[in-house]
UniProtKB/Swiss-Prot annotation:
Subunit structure: Component of mRNP complexes associated with HNRPA1. Component of the complex, at least composed of LRPPRC, BECN1 and BCL2; the interactions prevent BECN1 from forming an autophagy-inducing complex with PIK3C3. Interacts with CECR2, HEBP2, MAP1S and UXT. Interacts with PPARGC1A. Interacts with FOXO1. Interacts (via N-terminus) with EIF4E; the interaction promotes association of EIF4E with 4ESE-containing mRNAs. Interacts with exportin XPO1/CRM1; interacts both alone and in complex with EIF4E and 4ESE-containing mRNAs to form an EIF4E-dependent mRNA export complex.
Name this protein carries in UniProt: Leucine-rich PPR motif-containing protein, mitochondrial
Name of the gene: LRPPRC
Residues where Phosphoserine is found: S1026, S1027, S1029, S1138
Organism field: Homo sapiens (Human)
Interaction with BECN1 and Aedes aegypti venom allergen-1, as annotated region: 712-1067
PROSITE patterns: PPR
Chief subcellular location: mitochondrion
């Protein structure tokens, strides 16, 4: 063995290098390439151990089979989405807990199988999940699961390659599964799958796990003949092999052999040696080795120490566990690792050791109720731990305050697992502690017996309830007991006979609900007549509705309804029998489908007529609801029959007289000649000239008719002059604007344009004065405003204007015109970095944090400091960051700075700091920088150093590395990544596999895996490439890098240089550059590039995304005419614009009052609305808004009314949403329009029973803070309160928004009956929790509990999280699962009930 290893010394050194020589990498079976056999279509091979599958079924596959099984585009897309979803679910579980629950893996497996088509990634994902990620399963169960997955996916068409075999090997190793490595190799060769380095490494490990050194030597010999490098993983396996063969001396000597071969033993090798000592119970050698490691530069993580603990425990030496636990540093990643070890120990029946580790976990016990031990207790229940042990564990967990209610939780687990005997024993223990036992505790036990109709089992559980002093409630009887018997009477008799009927009245009411739901209306009528107890119609309504639908006896329908209407026992609500029965009829019809109503039309007609003869009446507003339902069900003939029940049949109301308005004259000259007002027409003409960029003519027109100019015309002219860089003209126009109306306000974009041009021309004080005016006049600040300020400041910074940057920034922030964000504070540091003044740059960055809590450009400052060796300043920066933002942030800042500057040794020390964990956003940020700057070595080091970083997404890291290799055309390095992915057992996403395959193909290399098919055609292939008159790769590469770095000016300068030298890039480069430049500051340059590309590349066009961005930019710059033209061009090219782009155009036209162009856009998009995802209401709302803007309010209202009341409706009334129109009218303070809209909405409600508009208007009033107006509207139109679905949807949407608790509360105060709705008080609690309003949340909870309202788990979970956040005790047992779990549970419950 030693000779084999030493002879491979030169190869080991080669393997340790970042890149092997090309000659070595092309050797057959080398680390980078596979044998020619592996290039054949991969066989659908089965597991190779133990003859799991027959050879015929394992290896039969033909190349043409792939053609037969080709999938459609839609199917491929579905499979891709399916894999992404599965990966996301499993990845999330691993990141959060370090493990995968069996149920989740089973669900992903089942869903994947149901999808019908499978790629290699699906199989790889599922196989790799069957090892150590399943600590809750026994080892043999894990392997069995893996084999089942292999068999099933093979039948479904999965194609296996070497990565799948390697994954199966990994599972075998993790599960200690015994198999024949030689048979495994033979099966692979039969399947035309060539083993690679990873395969051989894992086969060696399999021999070593059973102490077979001879077998390992054979595999090592194979590796030598194939010139494969022997890595540390092989040496670590050999340590284990010698130890398990009883040869500890040679196990220790492996470390010496490693050093002789040029490899220094790493943490993995020492861990193998430590585990070997632990398996022998040799605590002394373990301690000595740990001390040796501590003195070296190596670092063993807590998870490594936990593995040593497991080795001691499993080998029968639990007495040494405490000594190893003392050495645990409790890194942040420790908890999930410890939890997984605890689960594994319980699985191995080592519960006492598991408890010892659990009690040693560093869990805070001062943050309110704790449930940390829940996972341990639940798994103990699953593994059938004796009840005596369980109660003892619960007692210990409670004593140390690690779990606030361990017994109750364990009981909960036993009930869910249907472990009856354990549950009963635990209930007794819970009761002995003084806690009440509720009826619903027994439901999980009853449900199984109900399914089996096990009467004796039901009786035993009911007796058990009596023993514990628990009486069944109505739900228990209705849902679980009565369904087991032939009838309610037989159930009563048998229960009485067995002494299980403790509350006869409770059972009677439950029996009524049960028989009603089953359609036994004879029983219901008889019961209601003879009953002496008051029963609320509300309590039996849902059961009665089911019964009515299941019985066709109209006489019974009528008699029961009459009894409910006339008997005071059943209609005790304040609203009286008329309204109660009215709502019952409405709910009856609403609960039916349209086909059911049509089938029962005659029965319903008879029902209505019989009720009319019985003098049963319903309110008018409820009749209207019924009428709308009947219309939507296409049975209008029933409306007249339902109308018979209305209390007052006078449904005619006086129509409100509509007002009229004058029409505008056609031309300015005609108006002037007739000596009539011309202001409106003059303004419109100014606006048109501005849109055409005709500045000279617009200014001439202004001078000619100056006395008739209005503020809107001046505003447009100011903006035009700013665009043309005419600073003096803009200032003069602004002065005239102020003289005309000192209170007038420009819109935000025009103010920003004016500030920008003033700052650019050095008029700093004028610019600051404009900023002050923006504040004084309370100008609306948009999202784009802060970005515009940044560009203005950054331009000054690059020019080195320190005082300009400082004063403008201070003015903007002090006046509150922009948040002092990191982005807007960048120029403050940039101006000093440009001058090389690092000390001042750091001081300014620190000053920004002290003032604004942002730290701009700290990475760039640190890199400069590291490069200059400014240790004092580095220490100062790090001390500050650590103190203010925490040690984790400081470590990442320093890590990235060291990486960026090539100080990899220091970077390694940082990333190995105990407790550090992956911050995905920060890692991705640095990866993007490396890719954009083409920093290959830096990114490679990042990927290498983060290999063992907790929660690091290794696939994403390798994907970033491959992106860089793709740019550089480096297939050799990309090929090495494929081996590393397998070595690390990483599950590659489809995008990673596609990218790797693309790189290999571009290098004329074979692809050694099945490539997932694309469901779409990549945009870049649709761009027409052009052969340049002169090719200059450096220019093109530079411009692409500048684009990735978001360096607009730099990219544009490269374009100009290339243009001067007559260099033409390909179409894709120009598209990227145009998209980059398409911002407010560089729009002109973007159009210049576009024009150049169009004249130099035949057929050049922007793609859908770029054109959509162009449209949005044109709208933002108020180039509406150009935006409409661009939209037309996009559609002519058969492209699909984004919904956002189209919506922005329409909304901007509406704000200008441009009805004509909105209609033009509508015609252009005719038939394309669905593909864009554009609602017809976008046009309806904005055309109406445009008409209102033109003071043509009556026309807007008339159009809306016609659409809602005509027979041929464009949109059904219930979907006719006018909320946008109402909101804009209210925001713009268009009072005449608000008044007329209110009249229209009320008229539609009162005359036509169309309540959607008035309800939308009511809600918009509330949302705008006009609560008194909303209250008055509600008093005039009470039907608003009955539009429950609309109201609840509004509450739900607002509960998701920050700062909307007052809005939600206002709606509930105005409509108190909504408070009874579960969705309503859930929304209110959600709002309180988001705003951390503990006092209001407490009041809500106390109010609901006082009314005995049944609160769902999601409500309680939210409330509990708020109390814990505030450091207050939780007055109930907090639901143990996640928010997502309870939200999904509630969603399913509602879907089932509907």
């Amino acid at each position: 063995m030693a000779a084999l290893l030493r002879s491979a010394r030169w190869l080991l050194r080669a393997g340790a290098a970042p890149r092997l020589p090309l000659s070595l990498r092309l050797l057959p079976g080398g680390p980078g390439r596979l044998h020619a056999a592996s290039y054949l279509p991969a066989a659908r091979a089965g597991p190779v151990a133990g003859g799991l599958l027959s050879p015929a079924r394992l290896y039969a596959i033909a190349a043409k089979e792939k053609d037969i099984q080709e999938e459609s585009t839609f199917s491929s897309r579905k499979i891709s989405n399916q894999f992404d979803w599965a990966l996301m679910r499993l990845d999330l579980s691993v990141r959060r807990t370090g493990r995968i629950p069996k149920k989740l893996l089973q669900k992903v497996f089942n869903d994947t199988c149901r999808s019908g088509g499978l790629g290699g990634s699906h199989a790889l994902l599922l196989l790799r999940s069957c090892g150590s990620l399943l600590p809750e399963l026994k080892l043999e169960e894990r392997t069995e699961f893996a084999h089942r997955i292999w068999d099933t996916l093979q039948k479904l068409g999965a194609v296996y390659d070497v990565s799948h075999y390697n994954a199966l090997l990994k599972v075998y190793l993790q599960n200690e599964y015994k198999f024949s490595p030689t048979d495994f190799l033979a099966k692979m060769e039969e399947a035309n799958i060539q083993p690679n380095r990873v395969t051989y490494q894992r086969l060696i490990a399999s021999y070593c796990n059973v102490g077979d050194i001879e077998g390992a030597s054979k595999i090592l010999g194979f590796m030598k003949t194939k010139d494969l490098p022997v890595t540390e993983a092989v040496f670590s396996a050999l340590v284990t092999g010698h130890a398990r063969a009883g040869d500890m001396e040679n196990a220790e000597n492996i470390l010496t052999v490693m050093r002789d071969a040029g490899i220094e033993p790493g943490p993995d090798t020492y861990l193998a040696l430590l585990n070997a000592y632990a398996e022998k119970g040799d605590i002394d050698h373990v301690k000595q080795t740990l001390e040796k490691v501590e003195k070296s530069e190596l670092h063993l993580m807590d998870r490594d120490l936990l593995q040593i603990i497991f080795s001691f425990s499993k080998a029968g030496y639990p007495q040494y566990v405490s000594e190893i636990l003392e050495k645990v540093t409790c890194e942040r990643r420790y908890i999930p690792d410890a939890m997984n070890l605890i689960l594994l120990l319980v699985t191995e029946k080592l519960e006492d050791v598991a408890l010892q580790i659990l009690l040693a976990c560093p869990v805070s016990k001062e943050d309110g109720p704790s449930v940390f031990g829940s996972f341990f207790l639940q798994h103990c229940v699953t593994m059938n731990t004796p009840v005596e042990k369980l109660t003892d564990y619960c007692k210990k967990l409670k004593e140390v305050q690690m779990h606030s209610f361990p017994l109750q939780f364990t009981l909960h687990c036993a009930l869910l697992a249907n472990k009856t005997d354990l549950a009963k024993a635990l209930m007794k223990a819970v009761k002995e502690e003084g806690f009440p036992i509720r009826p619903h505790y027994f439901w999980p036990l009853l449900v199984g017996r109900r399914k089996e109709k096990n009467v004796q089992g039901i009786i035993e559980i009911l007796k058990g309830m009596q023993e514990l002093g628990v009486h069944p409630d109505q739900e228990t009887y209705t849902d679980y007991v009565i369904p087991c018997f032939d009838s309610v009477n037989s159930a009563r008799a048998i229960l009485q006979e067995n002494g299980c009927l403790s509350d006869s009245d409770m059972f009677s009411q439950a029996g009524l609900r049960s028989e009603a739901a089953n359609g036994n209306l004879d029983f219901v009528l008889s019961f209601l007549k003879s009953n002496t107890l008051p029963i609320s119609l509300q309590s039996i309504r849902s059961s009665l509705l089911l019964g009515f639908r299941r019985s066709m006896n109209i006489n019974l329908w009528s008699e029961i309804t009459e009894l409910l209407y006339k008997d005071g026992r059943y209609c005790q609500e304040p609203r009286g029998p008329t309204e109660a029965v009215g709502y019952f009829l409405y709910n009856l019809i609403d609960s039916m489908s349209d086909s059911e109503v049509q089938a029962k039309e005659e029965h319903l007609r008879q029902y209505f007529h019989q009720l009319e003869k019985m003098n049963v009446k319903i309110p008018e507003n409820i009749y209207r609801g019924i009428r709308n339902l009947l219309e939507s069900y296409h049975v209008p003939e029933l409306i007249k029959d339902a109308h018979l029940l209305v209390e007052s049949k006078n449904l005619d109301f006086q129509k409100t007289v509509q007002l009229t308005s004058s029409e505008l004259e056609s031309t300015l000259e005609t108006l002037k000649a007739e000596n009539q007002p011309i202001r409106d027409v003059l303004k419109q003409l100014i606006l048109v000239l501005c849109s055409e960029e005709n500045m000279q003519k617009a200014l001439e027109l202004k001078a000619k008719y100056e006395s008739d100019m209005v503020t809107g015309g001046y505003a447009a002219l100011i903006n035009l002059c700013c665009r043309h860089d005419k600073v003096e003209d803009a200032l003069n126009l602004k002065e005239e604007f102020d003289r005309l109306d000192s209170s007038a306000v420009l819109d935000t974009g025009k103010y920003v344009g004016l500030v920008r041009v003033l700052a650019k021309h050095g008029k700093l004080q004028d610019a600051i004065n404009i900023l002050k005016e923006m504040k004084e006049k309370d100008v609306l600040i948009k999202d784009t405003t802060a970005l515009s300020f940044f560009h203005m400041l950054n331009g000054a910074a690059l020019r080195g204007e320190i005082e300009t940057v400082k004063q403008l920034h201070e003015a903007i922030v002090t006046l509150g015109l922009a948040e002092p964000s990191t982005n807007i504070s960048f120029p403050l540091v940039t101006v000093h970095l440009e001058k090389g003044d690092l000390s001042t740059a750091l001081e300014v960055a620190i000053d920004c944090y002290e003032k604004y809590k942002v730290l701009p450009r700290i990475h760039d400052v640190l890199c400069k400091l590291v490069e200059k060796g400014e240790t004092d300043l580095i220490q100062k920066a790090m001390d500050f960051v650590s103190q203010e933002q925490g040690e984790m942030v400081m470590l990442y800042d320093l890590f990235f700075a060291f990486l960026q500057t090539g100080n990899y040794k220091e970077a390694k020390k940082i990333i190995e700091t105990p407790g550090i964990r992956a911050r995905s956003a920060r890692l991705q940020w640095f990866c993007d920088r490396c890719v954009a700057n083409n920093q290959v070595e830096t990114l490679e080091k990042l990927v290498e150093l983060t290999q063992k970083l907790f929660e690091c997404d290794r696939d994403q890291m390798y994907y970033n590395l491959l992106k860089l290799y793709k740019i550089n055309g480096d297939w050799q390095r990309a090929d090495a990544v494929w081996n590393k992915i397998q070595e690390e057992n990483v599950i590659p996403r489809e995008k990673t596999l596609r990218l790797l395959a693309e790189i290999l193909r571009e290098g004329n290399q074979e692809v050694p895996f099945d490539v997932p098919e694309l469901w779409y055609e990549d945009e870049k292939h649709s761009l027409n490439s052009s052969s340049a008159s002169t090719t200059e790769p450096d220019f093109q590469k530079d411009i692409l890098i500048a684009c990735r770095l978001n360096q607009k000016k730099g990219a544009y300068d490269i374009f100009l240089n290339a243009k001067e030298q007559n260099i033409v890039f390909n179409a894709e480069t120009y598209s990227n550059l145009i998209k980059l430049l398409m911002s407010e500051d560089y729009f002109t340059q973007a159009m210049e590039v576009k024009a150049f590309a169009e004249t130099h590349i035949k057929g050049f066009t922007l793609n859908d995304a770029a054109n959509s961005r162009l449209i949005i930019t044109q709208v933002r710059r108020d180039y509406l005419k150009e935006a409409v033209t661009t939209l037309k061009t996009v559609l002519d090219q058969q492209q699909t614009p984004s919904r956002l782009a189209v919506t922005r155009v329409i909304q901007a036209l509406a704000m200008k009052g441009d009805v004509e162009n909105i209609e033009v856009v509508q015609k252009m998009l005719n038939g394309l609305e669905d593909s864009i995802g554009l609602s017809k209401m976008v046009f309806i709302n904005n055309i109406a808004l445009a008409q209102i803007k033109n003071n043509n309010i009556d026309a807007a209202i008339e159009n809306i009314e016609n659409m809602l009341t005509s027979e041929n409706k464009v949109i059904e009334p219930q979907y006719f949403g006018l909320a946008y129109l109402f909101r804009k009218v209210i925001e713009e303070q268009l009072e005449p329009a608000v008044e007329k809209i209110s009249i229209m909405a009320e008229r539609l409600a009162n005359q036509f029973a169309i309540y959607k508009p008035v309800t939308d208007f009511f809600l918009q009033l509330v949302d705008a803070g006009k609560v008194d107006d909303a209250r008055a509207l509600l008093q005039r139109c009470g039907a608003i309160a009955e539009q429950t679905p609309i109201l609840l949807l509004f509450l739900l949407r607002n509960s998701r928004k920050q700062g909307k608790a007052s809005t939600v509360k206002s709606v509930l105060e105005l409509i108190p009956e909504l408070n009874e709705k579960e969705e309503a008080y859930n929304s209110l609690m959600k709002s309180y929790v988001s705003e951390k309003d503990v006092t209001s949340a407490k009041a809500l909870y106390e109010h609901l509990t006082a009314k005995n309202t049944k609160l769902d788990d999601l409500f309680l979970k939210r409330y509990a999280s708020l109390l814990k956040y505030a450091g207050e005790p939780v007055p109930f047992i907090e639901p143990p699962e996640s928010f997502e779990f309870y939200a999904q549970q509630l969603r399913k419950l509602r879907e089932n009930s509907s």
